[in-house]
């Protein structure tokens, strides 16, 4: 009887030999290692992808911040260009500042000169005490006004108004088309131009505000 016939007569032995002839443990172990390696690679890949996503997100934030800074710088540059165009050049700006400084000095000088003239005017005027305070009576102008008081009732009314103004410290400087306001609290003089562009309401409000200081 051949070996094949013996195996067929004993199938259990036959299956045992067949199983032993196929040693798949190494293959199973190899597949496990491969599966493990694949899992490791997958985890590392996901970690790298997450890290790259974080870098991209951070880069986007920095990019947006840079865009905002660039927009601000562009706005500043445009404003600077407009200012440069307005003043022309640095030398022109310096010249303008010097001119303004000179103008300010001239105004201060004129103000001081006017104050001196006003002090001289007050010096040549008579100070009359009244129950309500003191008033200024000009020695030179009053006689001329009194002569004019006999002309017409309207002129007399205007003269009375001028006397009232003068008693309050308001003097009409018709020669220079302006009003001089003597502030009693500090002795300084305020000037109100008799400009037609100014309303009577504004002129009256300005005078009373100065008299109240």
Curated annotation (Swiss-Prot):
Residues 54-123 form a coiled coil. Gene3D superfamilies: 3.30.160.430. The lineage of its organism: Eukaryota, Fungi, Dikarya, Ascomycota, Saccharomycotina. GO terms for biological process: cell division; centromere clustering; chromosome segregation; sister chromatid biorientation. Present with 1750 molecules/cell in log phase SD medium. The gene is SPC24. The keyword Coiled coil applies. This is Kinetochore protein SPC24. It is found in: Nucleus; Chromosome, Centromere, Kinetochore. The modification N-acetylserine is found at residue 2. It holds the Pfam family Spc24. Component of the NDC80 complex, which consists of TID3/NDC80, NUF2, SPC24 and SPC25. The NDC80 complex is formed by two subcomplexes, TID3/NDC80-NUF2 and SPC24-SPC25, which are joined end-to-end through their coiled-coil domains. It has a rod-like structure with a length of 570 Angstroms and globular domains at either end. The TID3/NDC80-NUF2 globular domains are probably directed to microtubules, the SPC24-SPC25 globular domains to the centromere. Can also interact with MPS2. It comes from Saccharomyces cerevisiae (strain ATCC 204508 / S288c). Belongs to the SPC24 family. It comes from the Eukaryota. InterPro entries: Ndc80_Spc24, Spc24_Fungi_globular_sf. Acts as a component of the essential kinetochore-associated NDC80 complex, which is involved in chromosome segregation and spindle checkpoint activity. The keyword ATP-binding does not apply. Its main location: nucleus. Keywords: Acetylation, Cell cycle, Cell division, Centromere, Chromosome, Coiled coil, Kinetochore, Mitosis, Nucleus. One of its GO terms (cellular component) is kinetochore. GO terms for molecular function: identical protein binding.
């Amino acid at each position: 009887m051949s070996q094949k016939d013996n195996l067929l007569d004993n199938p259990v032995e036959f299956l045992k030999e067949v199983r032993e002839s196929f040693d798949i443990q190494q293959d199973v172990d190899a597949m496990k290692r491969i599966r493990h390696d694949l899992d490791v690679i997958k985890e590392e890949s996901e970690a790298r992808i997450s890290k790259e996503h974080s870098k991209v997100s951070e880069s986007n934030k920095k990019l947006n911040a840079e865009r905002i800074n660039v927009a601000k710088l562009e706005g500043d540059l445009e404003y600077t260009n407009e200012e440069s165009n307005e003043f022309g050049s640095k030398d022109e700006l310096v010249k303008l500042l010097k001119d303004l400084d000179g103008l300010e000095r001239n105004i201060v000088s004129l103000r001081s000169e006017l104050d001196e003239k006003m002090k001289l005017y007050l010096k040549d005027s008579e100070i009359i005490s009244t129950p309500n305070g003191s008033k200024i009576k000009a020695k030179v102008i009053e006689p001329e006004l009194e002569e004019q008081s006999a002309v017409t009732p309207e002129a007399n009314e205007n003269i009375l108004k001028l006397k009232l103004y003068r008693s309050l410290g308001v003097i009409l400087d018709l020669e220079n088309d302006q009003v001089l306001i003597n502030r009693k609290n500090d002795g300084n003089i305020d000037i109100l131009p008799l400009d037609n562009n100014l309303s009577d309401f504004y002129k009256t409000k300005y005078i009373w505000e100065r008299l109240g200081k």
